[in-house]
């Protein structure tokens, strides 16, 4: 049986994203004991008690020569709230990632929608594979905001109308746009996160240029900031070696 929809839900609009580190087991020392078991066997356990700063050269060597598996023995879980179109891109990253997302079958979806902020460049110039984004005019910004908000309101009214008529949530949700906010938990390790950051952020130190959509880059930047605090030596080696995942 479908629940009666709440009458007081009014659409709200956001131009930001939420990223929170909710759980972690991640430190530079994790890289060291994982790497040293190759040559030290059981004695690699001694790395658990040592200051990883003394072995930052090893971390840099592993990153530079792309010995990747030692960077997998750690874990970070993030809570993320972002538009559905961001999650469409995010979940293309499958190796080293686990996801659980809010369900539109099991709960009534809240009317929170994405509208680009003033800093979001709106106009694409150039051809596929060679283009840039430039600032939109004031008229384009106003048009984008107005049309998006009107469209979101109409879509959510249709969703509510179907729910009120007894239509199942899993059917009614079909009218909702990809600008609707969803939420999920995403768990990764440092290696899988570095691969994500190499593709989904732009950075002056990157050997291989990437051209991510700005909204997923916003998520990536927040995740990167949290990871940098947990594994500063690994993070420094990542940047020093061109932001290419090992």
UniProtKB/Swiss-Prot annotation:
Q: Which residues bind FAD?
A: 69, 92-94, 101, 189-191, 195
Source organism superkingdom = Bacteria
Tell me the GO BP annotations in alphabetical order.
dTMP biosynthetic process; dTTP biosynthetic process; methylation
How is this protein organized at the quaternary level? Homotetramer.
Q: In which pathway does it act?
A: Pyrimidine metabolism; dTTP biosynthesis
Record motif ThyX motif, residues: 92-103
Which free-text remark accompanies the cofactor? Binds 4 FAD per tetramer. Each FAD binding site is formed by three monomers.
Q: What is its EC number?
A: 2.1.1.148
Q: Which GO MF terms are attached to this record?
A: flavin adenine dinucleotide binding; NADPH binding; thymidylate synthase (FAD) activity; thymidylate synthase activity
User: What is the primary gene name for this protein?
Assistant: thyX
Fetch the InterPro entries from UniProt.
Answer: Thymidylate_synthase_ThyX, Thymidylate_synthase_ThyX_sf
Family of the protein in this entry: Belongs to the thymidylate synthase ThyX family.
Per the Swiss-Prot or TrEMBL record, the active site comprises 200 (involved in ionization of n3 of dump, leading to its activation)
CDD domains (alphabetical): ThyX
All residue ranges annotated as the ThyX domain in the record? 17-241
Q: Give the lineage.
A: Bacteria, Bacillati, Actinomycetota, Actinomycetes, Kitasatosporales
What is the protein's known function?
A: Catalyzes the reductive methylation of 2'-deoxyuridine-5'-monophosphate (dUMP) to 2'-deoxythymidine-5'-monophosphate (dTMP) while utilizing 5,10-methylenetetrahydrofolate (mTHF) as the methyl donor, and NADPH and FADH(2) as the reductant.
Enzyme kind, highest EC tier: transferase
Binding of dUMP occurs at 89-92, 101-105, 173, 200
What name goes with this protein?
Answer: Flavin-dependent thymidylate synthase
Cofactor(s) needed by this chain: FAD
Which keywords fit this entry according to its UniProt record? FAD, Flavoprotein, Methyltransferase, NADP, Nucleotide biosynthesis, Transferase
Q: Read off the SUPFAM superfamilies from this record.
A: Thymidylate synthase-complementing protein Thy1
Catalytically driven reaction(s): dUMP + (6R)-5,10-methylene-5,6,7,8-tetrahydrofolate + NADPH + H(+) = dTMP + (6S)-5,6,7,8-tetrahydrofolate + NADP(+)
């Amino acid at each position: 049986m479908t629940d009666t929809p709440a009458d007081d839900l009014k659409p709200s609009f956001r131009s930001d994203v939420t990223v929170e580190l909710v759980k972690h087991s991640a430190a530079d020392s994790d890289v060291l004991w994982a790497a040293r078991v190759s040559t030290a066997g059981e004695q690699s356990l001694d790395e658990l008690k040592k200051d990883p700063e003394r072995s930052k050269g090893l971390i840099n060597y592993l990153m530079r020569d792309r010995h990747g598996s030692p960077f997998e023995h750690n874990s970070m879980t993030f809570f993320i709230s972002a538009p559905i179109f961001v999650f469409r891109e995010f979940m293309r990253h499958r190796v080293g990632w686990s996801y659980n997302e809010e369900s539109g079958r099991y709960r009534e979806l809240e009317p929170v929608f994405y509208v680009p902020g003033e800093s979001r460049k709106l106009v694409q110039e150039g051809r596929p594979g060679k283009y840039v984004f430039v600032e939109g005019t004031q008229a384009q910004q106003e048009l984008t905001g107005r049309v998006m908000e009107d469209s979101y309101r109409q879509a959510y009214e249709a969703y509510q109308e179907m729910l009120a008529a007894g239509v199942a949530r899993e059917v009614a949700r079909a009218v909702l746009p990809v600008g609707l906010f969803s939420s999920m938990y995403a768990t990764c390790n440092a290696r899988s996160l570095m691969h994500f950051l190499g593709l989904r952020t732009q950075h002056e130190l990157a050997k291989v240029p990437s051209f991510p959509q700005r909204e997923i880059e916003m998520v990536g930047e927040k995740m990167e900031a949290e990871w940098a605090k947990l594994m500063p030596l690994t993070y420094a080696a990542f940047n020093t070696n061109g932001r290419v995942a090992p």
